Design a protein with these regions (language model features):
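Unchanged
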Residues: 78-163, 167, 172-173, 181
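Conserved Nudix-box catalytic region and its N-terminal flanking loop in Nudix hydrolases
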Residues: 52-94
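Nucleotide phosphate-binding site architecture
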Residues: 11, 18-19, 33, 58, ...
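Conserved hydrophobic/aromatic beta-strand scaffold that supports enzyme active sites
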Residues: 9, 29, 50, 59, ...
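Short connector loops at helix/strand junctions that flank enzyme active sites
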Residues: 27, 44-46, 52, 66-68, ...
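Active-site donor-binding loop signature of nucleotide-sugar glycosyltransferases
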Residues: 34, 62, 75, 123, ...
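Acidic, metal-coordinating catalytic segment for phosphate/diphosphate chemistry
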Residues: 2-49
Length: 181
């Protein structure tokens, strides 16, 4: 379960916070008992791609926790000052060393229990030269039947890949929205 009461100390003065509903609000917030600062917590955006070369999809084997050693699509946390598309391209370059051309937003997945929103773009690889970064053990292309389904790191990756291959079989790609438990 997601811990909604994570802010223990004020980011302004360092004093202890208390959770209560501020005036003119409808949700509990962390409020500083000393300076009155109200702290808002919002979901984090995870951005990534489904990089494709012909009939193959590029996956990365994680060199970091959580889920060390398991396979994932190239993705990571969006940074301030970038768009979701820019973040997806950056993460693909950082994790796989891959150059891509985005082809449109593909999945938007709400992962409420961990306070995240995952956005994956379809992407075309510009070549097959990969240079995995420090967060990746290896980057490898897989045909659908070769995907290590039992070794995927995250449910959002599984959902995205399943929807990608289903759409590809139908000959058209749609935007998929879902809530992941």
């Amino acid at each position: 379960m997601f811990d909604m009461h994570r802010i223990k100390h004020c980011r302004v003065c360092g004093s202890a916070t208390q959770y209560r509903v501020p005036a003119d609000d409808n949700r509990e917030r962390a409020i500083c008992g000393a300076c009155g600062e109200i702290h808002y917590e919002n979901p984090l955006n995870v951005v990534g791609t489904v990089p494709v070369w012909g009939e193959q999809v590029l996956l990365c084997r994680r060199n970091i926790e959580p889920r060390y050693g398991l396979w994932t699509l190239p993705a990571g946390f969006m940074e301030l000052g970038e768009t979701t598309a820019e973040g997806a391209v950056r993460e693909t370059e950082e994790e796989a060393g891959a150059r891509i051309e985005l082809q449109g937003l593909f999945t938007l997945l709400n992962v409420v229990r961990v306070g995240q929103v995952h956005l994956f773009y379809r992407a075309r690889l510009q070549d097959t030269q990969f240079a995995p970064g420090p967060e990746t053990i290896e980057a490898q292309l897989f045909h659908e039947q070769q995907i290590p389904w039992d070794q995927l790191a995250f449910r959002t990756v599984r959902e995205t890949l399943q929807r990608y291959f289903a759409d590809r079989r139908q000959g058209r790609f749609e935007l998929h929205l879902a809530d992941i438990g």
